[in-house]
């Protein structure tokens, strides 16, 4: 014979819907995915364009990496879309002017895209910056997490956000592989 306590342990719990805890978990996943995306951008951008004196090339690269690490996602996207990913016809161009005395070097690696693909990627990345900023700075202002319906709406928005940043991360990973292959070919 079983008592009521045993029955409660073995019977399935009815779906209680979306909770604030579910939303918090998904929010954390979104933020972590955005950080992974940002770190991948930093890894690419820190080394795609390097200029300096050939007397101290390691110092130049260290400085470039340090400068890149301090940039926000918005600045990184701006850098990526003006110097790493470029539309056909603008390859080899760089806004950066380096004035050095003596022997110097400049290394610039770019991925050239058809104009329509460049425009699509640029719009997607600008939208990602806006989405990330909205999540980080306004999520609680825009969502009511005190009700099940509010949590459900927040969860749906986070699922869409996670899907978008995951697709962007996967696309950027593909570009990073192209970058690594080109770097290896040059070395």
Range-by-range predicted roles:
Residues 152-187:
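Amphipathic, Lys/Arg-enriched alpha-helical patches that create a basic surface
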């Amino acid at each position: 014979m079983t008592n009521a306590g045993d029955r409660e342990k073995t019977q399935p719990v009815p779906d209680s819907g979306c909770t604030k805890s579910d939303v918090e978990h998904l929010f954390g996943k979104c933020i972590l995915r955005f950080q992974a995306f940002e770190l991948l951008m930093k890894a690419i951008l820190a080394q795609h364009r390097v200029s300096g004196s050939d007397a101290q090339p390691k110092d130049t690269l260290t400085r470039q990496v340090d400068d890149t690490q301090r940039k926000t996602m918005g600045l990184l996207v701006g850098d990526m879309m003006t110097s790493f990913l470029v539309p056909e016809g603008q390859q080899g161009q760089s806004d950066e002017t380096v004035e050095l005395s003596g022997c110097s070097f400049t290394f610039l690696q770019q991925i050239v895209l058809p104009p329509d693909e460049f425009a699509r990627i640029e719009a997607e990345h600008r939208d990602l910056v806006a989405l990330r900023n909205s999540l980080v700075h306004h999520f609680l202002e825009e969502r009511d997490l005190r009700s099940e319906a509010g949590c459900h709406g927040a969860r749906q928005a986070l699922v869409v956000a996670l899907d978008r940043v995951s697709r962007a991360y996967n696309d950027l990973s593909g570009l990073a592989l192209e970058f690594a292959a080109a770097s290896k070919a040059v070395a």
